[in-house]
Amino acid sequence: MVNLVIVSHSAMLGEGVEMLARQMLTGDNCRIAVAAGIDDPDHPIGTDPIKVMEAIEAVADTDHVLVMMDMGSALLSAETALDLLDPVIAEKVRLCAAPLVEGTLAATVSAAAGADIDTVIDVAMNALAAKQAQLGITPPAHAASLPAQAPDSDARSVTVTIRNHHGLHVRPASRLVAALAGMNADLVLEKQGQCVKPDSLNQIALLQVRCHDAVTLSASGPDAERALAAFESLAAEDFGEHPESMALKTSASTVEKVQGKAVFYPLPLAQPARHPCSDVGQEERRLQQAIVDTLNDLNALAALAEKKYGASVAAIFSGHYTLLDDPDLFDAACKVIRNDSCCAESAWYQVLMELSQQYQHLDDAYLQARFIDIEDILYRSLCHLKGRDIRLPTPDVPAIIVADDIFPSAVVNLNAQLVKGICLREGSTLSHAAIIAQQAGIAFICQQGAVLDIIQPEDRLLIDPAAQRVSCA
């Protein structure tokens, strides 16, 4: 006798498939258990290995248990459950790669008829045949196992190590697919010699990317640089799975209306003058030293962030370090210095502002918001090049910072006892500045536009985070 376990990211989906499958039964010769969703009312979509283990145990009084899964972390949770189970029970369990709905229905019918486990699996794996025949579709032989072609020899590539606990499962993989969608580039995602096109969740799933795996994105074509930048940034952000990706989800309920004196903070980044240089080597050395100094700053900022707000905020500046510690950026700036015989400040500004523009033109709002991080790094490194101090807002009375936008490094340095709120003409609630402000308990509103034109220095302001509104108190 074969019993079934249905594993899905969604409790509603899992229960719905179970309901359909039970319509196939006329007796109790195939029992079905469900392990779907997670016990978090705010974020119910996901899979839980403990639930899977308990579901298997509930129907383990049989010869075999067949586990049907949707995709991504459902497979990982099922595999983890096998490790947690009593070995005697684990020996009975088989994981099935068939499509969840059609495969479960077919497996239920076969199991209820008394078929052995191998037959049940075979029937489930061929469950799409009827639908394909009805639609006149001839399935390509071995389509799912065919890898993409290896990247062209002239393609550029970026390799990252996956830090997501469950690897590239549905949610992080979907963010990758969305970020790369529509780019005019030939893209190949590779892990240990296996190559797929990163435009399909299913293809990415075929790579079975686990935590600590190294994966490489290769790109050629007009949008190759944009694609690689998006991939590298997403990886630095753990593909949106980091707790910081929730941004201001609860900020409206945790920060009340606040008042303070208006303190203007003009974004300190300005385009440097383009001076000619007579010693190219000297300019390259100046730039290299400024980058080293900035990397040291970012390490210090990460330490400060961890001390004040924990590891999730510290990871922001560790990500900045990764973005800056890229020899391609330095090489690109050196090329500008040599070709244009210009100073390091001008060349560095050109290269990083081009990168900032690439981020701003991405379709993914989460990635778009990262352009200000690039400009934060640029400002800090220009200060080192020019021998200038970093300019930060330091009010001495309860204040509301008023600015066009604000750097994450400025927010992490704010005295949250005195800075009651941040009010931006532009900005984004998905920005790292917003995330840090929320951790600090500082009210944050953005996209205020022309409303800020009527505010004068020393005005007393009232910020309502829930309404995303500012007014004179």
Swiss-Prot record:
The active site is at 9 (tele-phosphohistidine intermediate), 169 (pros-phosphohistidine intermediate), 432 (tele-phosphohistidine intermediate). Residues 1-137 form the PTS EIIA type-4 domain. The keyword Cell membrane does not apply. SUPFAM superfamilies: Enzyme I of the PEP:sugar phosphotransferase system HPr-binding (sub)domain, HPr-like, Phosphohistidine domain, PTS system fructose IIA component-like. GO terms for biological process: glycerol catabolic process; phosphoenolpyruvate-dependent sugar phosphotransferase system. The keyword DNA-binding does not apply. Residues 266-472 are annotated as: PTS EI-like, N-terminal part. Residues 155-242 form the HPr domain. Coiled coil: none annotated. Its EC number is 2.7.1.121. Homodimer. The dihydroxyacetone kinase complex is composed of a homodimer of DhaM, a homodimer of DhaK and the subunit DhaL. Unlike the carbohydrate-specific transporters of the PTS, the complex DhaKLM has no transport activity. This is PEP-dependent dihydroxyacetone kinase, phosphoryl donor subunit DhaM. It comes from Pantoea ananatis (strain LMG 20103). The gene is dhaM.
